[in-house]
Amino acid sequence: MSMLCYTLIIAFLIGIWAAPKSEDNVPLGSPAKSDFSDTNCAQTHEGLKTSRNTDQHHPTPKKSEDQELGSAANIIVDPKLFQKRRFQSPRVLFSTQPPPLSRDEQSVKFLDTEDTLNRNIWANNENHPVHNQGEHSVCDSISVWVTNKTKATDIKGNTVTVMVDVNLNNEVYKQYFFETKCRNPNPVPSGCRGIDSRHWNSYCTTTDTFVKALTMEGNRASWRFIRIDTACVCVISRKTENF
């Protein structure tokens, strides 16, 4: 019996000695949880002040519209990506300098492997000059280099982001597109030039085609077929005869 009492007393003393003494780590007069929450609140409040002051001196930058619109000078493009480029078009040019604005500027040199193809376009146009002996275009068109194309429609009909600036080998290249559009849907009052308006309705319209261009897919550059304006044609329809 006495042995059992001694055992219970020893177990009781061991239990008291092993109990955690949270008061040892707490300032006098304040419970443990109170100090922890007060400290956290103070740190949180101080953090909010610091964050607020930081925001005042350095406002949070908005999401770069240039990256969304294709200005990807900060995105480095692997040169191997250009080795995988297929179906090259003379209407797409990557250059560090602006391309010629018109075919009259023969002194401007292209900085792209498509230089020969582009010069062939100018040569073909010059080998067939327009004379005054009745040789006139059915529609009047204008061709320009587009330097700020940021959005386009791909071959699946989706709107994609076109890269304007390309960082290649630590040099920033711009992506240019040579587009042709109608200058006027009705070059003459009756519609297209040279069409018999007594029997035909006519008007000029811009047509497009697909070219391989460098686009953004998330944070990566990829080749896609996009739609650009490439020609001005005449659309005709027979007039209905009234009896």
From Swiss-Prot:
<dbReference type="GO" id="GO:0005163">
    <property type="term" value="F:nerve growth factor receptor binding"/>
</dbReference>
<feature type="disulfide bond">
    <location>
        <begin position="192"/>
        <end position="234"/>
    </location>
</feature>
<keyword id="KW-0339">Growth factor</keyword>
<dbReference type="GO" id="GO:0030424">
    <property type="term" value="C:axon"/>
</dbReference>
<comment type="subunit">
    <text>Homodimer.</text>
</comment>
<keyword id="KW-0964">Secreted</keyword>
<dbReference type="InterPro" id="IPR020425">
    <property type="entry name" value="Nerve_growth_factor_bsu"/>
</dbReference>
<keyword id="KW-0481">Metalloenzyme inhibitor</keyword>
<keyword id="KW-0446">Lipid-binding</keyword>
<keyword id="KW-0732">Signal</keyword>
<dbReference type="GO" id="GO:0008191">
    <property type="term" value="F:metalloendopeptidase inhibitor activity"/>
</dbReference>
<dbReference type="GO" id="GO:0005615">
    <property type="term" value="C:extracellular space"/>
</dbReference>
<dbReference type="GO" id="GO:0008289">
    <property type="term" value="F:lipid binding"/>
</dbReference>
<dbReference type="GO" id="GO:0021675">
    <property type="term" value="P:nerve development"/>
</dbReference>
<feature type="disulfide bond">
    <location>
        <begin position="139"/>
        <end position="204"/>
    </location>
</feature>
<feature type="compositionally biased region" description="Basic and acidic residues">
    <location>
        <begin position="47"/>
        <end position="66"/>
    </location>
</feature>
<keyword id="KW-0646">Protease inhibitor</keyword>
<dbReference type="GO" id="GO:0038180">
    <property type="term" value="P:nerve growth factor signaling pathway"/>
</dbReference>
<feature type="region of interest" description="Disordered">
    <location>
        <begin position="47"/>
        <end position="70"/>
    </location>
</feature>
<dbReference type="Pfam" id="PF00243">
    <property type="entry name" value="NGF"/>
</dbReference>
<feature type="disulfide bond">
    <location>
        <begin position="182"/>
        <end position="232"/>
    </location>
</feature>
<dbReference type="InterPro" id="IPR002072">
    <property type="entry name" value="Nerve_growth_factor-rel"/>
</dbReference>
<dbReference type="GO" id="GO:0008021">
    <property type="term" value="C:synaptic vesicle"/>
</dbReference>
<dbReference type="GO" id="GO:0030425">
    <property type="term" value="C:dendrite"/>
</dbReference>
<keyword id="KW-0325">Glycoprotein</keyword>
<protein>
    <recommendedName>
        <fullName>Venom nerve growth factor</fullName>
    </recommendedName>
</protein>
<feature type="glycosylation site" description="N-linked (GlcNAc...) asparagine">
    <location>
        <position position="148"/>
    </location>
</feature>
<dbReference type="GO" id="GO:0090729">
    <property type="term" value="F:toxin activity"/>
</dbReference>
<dbReference type="GO" id="GO:0050804">
    <property type="term" value="P:modulation of chemical synaptic transmission"/>
</dbReference>
<keyword id="KW-0483">Metalloprotease inhibitor</keyword>
<feature type="propeptide">
    <location>
        <begin position="19"/>
        <end position="125"/>
    </location>
</feature>
<dbReference type="InterPro" id="IPR020408">
    <property type="entry name" value="Nerve_growth_factor-like"/>
</dbReference>
<dbReference type="InterPro" id="IPR019846">
    <property type="entry name" value="Nerve_growth_factor_CS"/>
</dbReference>
<dbReference type="GO" id="GO:0043524">
    <property type="term" value="P:negative regulation of neuron apoptotic process"/>
</dbReference>
<dbReference type="GO" id="GO:0008083">
    <property type="term" value="F:growth factor activity"/>
</dbReference>
<feature type="signal peptide">
    <location>
        <begin position="1"/>
        <end position="18"/>
    </location>
</feature>
<dbReference type="GO" id="GO:0007169">
    <property type="term" value="P:cell surface receptor protein tyrosine kinase signaling pathway"/>
</dbReference>
<keyword id="KW-1015">Disulfide bond</keyword>
<keyword id="KW-0800">Toxin</keyword>
<dbReference type="GO" id="GO:0048812">
    <property type="term" value="P:neuron projection morphogenesis"/>
</dbReference>
<comment type="similarity">
    <text>Belongs to the NGF-beta family.</text>
</comment>
<comment type="function">
    <text>Nerve growth factor is important for the development and maintenance of the sympathetic and sensory nervous systems. It stimulates division and differentiation of sympathetic and embryonic sensory neurons as well as basal forebrain cholinergic neurons in the brain. Its relevance in the snake venom is not clear. However, it has been shown to inhibit metalloproteinase-dependent proteolysis of platelet glycoprotein Ib alpha, suggesting a metalloproteinase inhibition to prevent metalloprotease autodigestion and/or protection against prey proteases.</text>
</comment>
